Structures are given as C-alpha cells and as structure tokens.
UniProtKB/Swiss-Prot annotation:
Pfam families: Formyl_trans_C, Formyl_trans_N. GO terms for molecular function: methionyl-tRNA formyltransferase activity. It catalyses: L-methionyl-tRNA(fMet) + (6R)-10-formyltetrahydrofolate = N-formyl-L-methionyl-tRNA(fMet) + (6S)-5,6,7,8-tetrahydrofolate + H(+). The keyword RNA-binding does not apply. (6S)-5,6,7,8-tetrahydrofolate binds at S109, L110, L111, P112. Belongs to the Fmt family. The keyword GTP-binding does not apply. The gene is fmt. It comes from Wolbachia pipientis wMel. Keywords: Protein biosynthesis, Transferase. This is Methionyl-tRNA formyltransferase.
Length: 299
C-alpha cells in the first residue's frame, strides 16, 4: 500500500515510525515548514520532518494545499491512502478525493466529543473520566467524518497533558495499523452531530484568583507544563499540585508553603518553576523566596 503521511508534532511520531516498519510504503511525508525557535531563532524542523529525512523519504512543506500545482504534486505520488495526524493544514476536497481510500485521521478524543484543535486539554479541563482515539475518514467538516475505529481507556488521577498525550499517541498508532490492515473491511460509523462539542485552541494558561479550586487544579493538569500564577508581577509555573476542600479568602496565599485559597478549596502546589529557573519542589522554592511573597494574593 502506498501511503502519504501528513503530520508535524511529536504526537504523530509513533504512527510514522510504525508505518515505516510495516509492509506499506510511505511514499512522501507532508509536514509544517521549519519555523524559527530558541534564542537564536534558527529554523527548526518538526519531529516528523526529522524522522522522514532520516528514513530518506521525500518531505513536502507546502504553505497551502489549495493550489493546483500542489494538488498535482500530491496526485503524482499515486497514494492508496493518506494518513493524517496533527498535520496543521486544511485539506481541500481536491486532496481528500485523490487517494483510493481517501484520507484518514488519528484524532485523540472519543468523537464526536471534543472535535477541534485541543481535545486533550479540554478532556482534562472538563473532568472527563475517560478518553480515547478515533480513527476517522476525513471530510470537509471539522473532525466530522465517519469513524472507522475507536478505542477508549480510563483517565487516571495522576494523568496530565503529557501522560495522556503519550498514551493517546501510542494507542493511535496501534489503531491505525489495525485499520490499514483491514482497510477494505471497514464499516464506517456516522457521527451523531447532536453529541458534538468543540475543543478550541487554548491560549490562556493563567490560573486566576477568581477560578474555582477544581478548575485551577484541572488547569495544572491540562496545560502542563504551562499553567501559571502571577505574584507581584512574577510568573510562577505550577507543574504539579493537589487540592483540599478547606478555603479562606479567595486568591490569598494562606501559609508559608504557598497554599492558594480559591473558591471551593485550596490549591496545593507541589512542583513549581520561576521564569528563567529550573523546576523544583515547593519546599526548595520557598527556601529561596522572599518571605513577603508568600503572604500575598495571586493576580
């Protein structure tokens, strides 16, 4: 089977790696173009780009697939199927119709729940008890195509964005191979659009004094490692935390261990990181902190 693989971030790496070890032929890899990053702002290739080059596979980095020249190039690879995993570009109808078996997508949620760009974060923010992977046929809608295979698992108490991301990436690659091995036997299941909800891209990682305690706790998990508080205009990331039901004045840091009183409970930071410093336990952090800072309110 001739496969075009379309993906960019680390989530897609497991699937590409498994395909490269399979009997199928990956004839091309489509990924986002290198973009500047780091202090030197040097162009950095996506994780998928790096693996493809190491495997001597042609890499394509178009800025859009809406142009006829790009569509003709895609067609010339003569793909039987295109596999999409967090690619980052919209696939127009002309592209969707080229492969014999169409374009199939690895989506890290139990569709139709959490269609969109940030399903893992929204799964945690909503307090969902389970999650999973949906292998779906791409159409012109937003994650609205028929489902070819779906598998779920329970979310554990200690799971955060990273642990769920890694579990879903592994499950997605395994499910993908099952679908491809039985591609002509698939019985597509139509999604119920009435049950759909959407996972918009997350851009605000701040924990606010007005947040409920459980919401703040979920933010720590969902936005790992980016959730933060601000004290005296200093940004402090909270990488791990717990919470308890006791609470006092909302937004107040209530003791020398930096427990944060919020609506409905107290957030208890366990691992934190000040800007420009390495992560550390809350105990080590407090020892190196001005005592005045731990008697403030978060902003």
């Amino acid at each position: 089977m001739r496969i075009i693989f379309m993906g960019s971030p680390g989530f897609a790496v497991n699937s590409l790696s498994l395909l490269l070890k399979s009997k199928s032929e990956v004839v091309a890899v489509y990924t986002k173009a290198p973009k500047p990053s780091g202090r030197g702002q040097k162009p950095t290739k996506s994780p998928v780009h790096v693996i493809a080059e190491e495997s001597n596979i042609e890499v394509c980095t178009p800025i859009s697939l809406k142009f006829s020249a790009e569509q003709e190039k895609f067609r010339n690879f003569k793909p039987d199927v295109a596999v999409v995993a967090a690619y980052g570009l919209i696939l127009p109808r002309e592209i969707l119709n080229i492969p014999k078996y169409g374009c199939i997508n690895i989506h890290p949620s139990l569709l139709p729940r959490w269609r969109g760009a940030a399903p893992i974060q929204h799964t945690i923010l909503a307090g969902d008890q389970e999650t999973g992977v949906s292998i779906m046929q791409l159409d012109e809608g937003l994650d609205s195509g028929t489902i070819l295979k779906q598998e779920k698992f329970l979310i554990e108490k200690n799971d955060n964005y990273k642990t769920l991301h890694d579990k879903l990436s592994k499950l997605g690659s395994d499910l993908l191979l099952k679908v491809l091995n039985e591609i002509e036997k698939q019985l597509p299941l139509k999604q119920n659009d009435n049950d759909a909800c959407y996972a918009d891209k997350v851009e605000d990682y701040k924990i606010y004094a007005s947040d409920a305690c459980e919401v703040a706790y979920r933010k720590v998990k969902a936005f790992y490692p980016k959730a933060f508080i601000k004290i005296e205009n200093k940004r402090i990331r909270i990488l791990d935390a717990d919470f308890e039901a006791l609470a006092s004045e909302q937004g107040k840091i209530v003791n020398d261990n930096m427990h944060i009183s919020l609506k409905g409970g107290t957030l208890i930071p366990k691992v934190v990181q000040m800007e420009g410093r390495n992560p550390c336990s809350i105990e080590d952090f407090i020892r190196g902190l001005k005592s005045s800072m731990v008697k403030k309110f978060i902003e």
